[in-house]
Amino acid sequence: MIERYTLPEMGALWSEQNKFQKWLDVELAVCEVHAEMGTIPREAVAEIKGRATFSVERINEIERTTNHDVIAFTTNLAESIGEAARFVHYGLTSSDVVDTANALLLRDSCDLLRAKIDGLMDVLKRRALEFKNTPQVGRTHGVHAEPTSFGLTFALWYDEMRRHRERLKRAKEAVAVGKISGAVGAFAHLDPIVEEKVCVRLGLKAAPVSTQIIQRDGYAEYLSTLALIASSLDKFALTVRHLQRTEVREAQERFARGQKGSSAMPHKRNPIISERICGLARVIRANSLVGMENIALWHERDISHSSAERVVLPDSTIGLDYILQKTTSLIDGLVVYPERMLENLAATRGLIFSGQLLLALTRKE
C-alpha cells in the first residue's frame, strides 16, 4: 500500500524489516527444537542465536544474483553467523519459513484490526445513544418512506460491526497456522514433532495436512473477511455522502479550519473522507478475488500465488486498517443537523404517514 494510506503501526508490521525478522524467528525456533531433540548441537544453536543478524539492503543485493529471496536471506544470515550457519534451515524448504512467518504477520494484523473495530464500535454506540430520540425521515429507493430515528442508523452499524468482529476472529484462526513439513509436505527430512513444537513456540496451530505450502483457502477466507468489513465501511460512508448532499444536508463531515474543498469553487465542502473510504473499499474487495484465484495451484505447489500475495495481503490489511480509522474519525466528528431532519420530515406534507392512514381505513367498518 502506498504511504499515503499507511498508518505507522500497521505499516511497521508489514515492513520488509519485520518480514525478515519473522523469517528469522521461524528459523531460530526450528534450530531450538532441533537442539532439544538432539538433531543439531546445542552450542551451535547458542552461536546462531547470538550472532544472527540481517540487513534488508544486503538481502536485496544478494537476491539480484540468486533470484531467490529465501536463499538470499539465509546467505546473509550465514555472513554474520559463521561456521554454525550450516545448521540454519536444516531440513526445511522455503515455504516452511515463508508460510509460517506469514501466519505470524496475519495473526498480528488481526489483533490490530480487532482493536480498530472495537474503537469504531465504541463511537457507534455513543452516537446511537446520542441520537436515539432524533427523528429523521427513512428512505427506501432514495424516496421518503416513514419516520425513523437517526440513532437507529448507528445502532444498525454497531450490530454489523459486531458480526464483523466475530468474522475476523474466525479468519484469524484460519490463518494462524504454521507448517514445518519440508518439500511437498511429506516430512521426508523432518520429524513431525518438530513442526508441532515449533508452532507451539510461535503461538500457532500446526497445519493438520499440508503440501509444500499451507493451502490458500485460509488466505482467501482472510481476504474475503477484510472485503466484507470494507464493504460495510463503504456503506456507512455512502450514507454520509447522501446525507451531505446540498438537497438533503442532514449531516456532514467535520470541516477543519484551513481545509479547502475546491481549487475552483471556494464555497465547496465535499465529503472527501467518505469518498476515500468508498474508493479504498473497492480495492480491498477486488483483492479478495485474487485470494480465491490463488487457491488452485499445481500439484504440491507452484509459485503463481507468491507474487500476488506480496501485493494483496499487505495492501488489503493496511488499507482496511486505514479506512477503519478514517470511519471512526468520520462518525466521531460527524456534524448533524436535527432541524434540517425535521424540515425534511415535513417536506411531503404528511404523505409519510400514508401507511398509518391505510391501516385506519382497513379497520373502518
Task: Give the residues covered by each predicted segment.
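Generic, well-ordered alpha-helical scaffold segments in large soluble proteins
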Residues: V33, N76, S80, V123, ...
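Conserved helix-loop functional segments at active or binding sites
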Residues: E130-N133, R167-R170, A174, L204-P208, ...
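Acidic, glycine-rich loop-and-beta core segments that form the ion-binding/anion-interacting portion
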Residues: E195-S288
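A helix-coil-helix interface module used to build multimeric assemblies
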Residues: M1-F187, D191-K197, A206, Q259-S262, ...
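Short amphipathic alpha-helical segments with heptad-repeat character
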Residues: R107-R114, D118, K125, A155-Y158, ...
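A structural signal for small-residue-enriched, beta-sheet-centric alpha/beta enzyme cores
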Residues: A186, R201, A206-I213, L342, ...
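Glycine-rich cofactor/substrate-binding loops
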Residues: M1-K22, V26, A46, I62-T66, ...
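Short, well-ordered beta-strand elements within core beta-sheets of diverse protein domains
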Residues: L152, A220-L228, Q356-K364
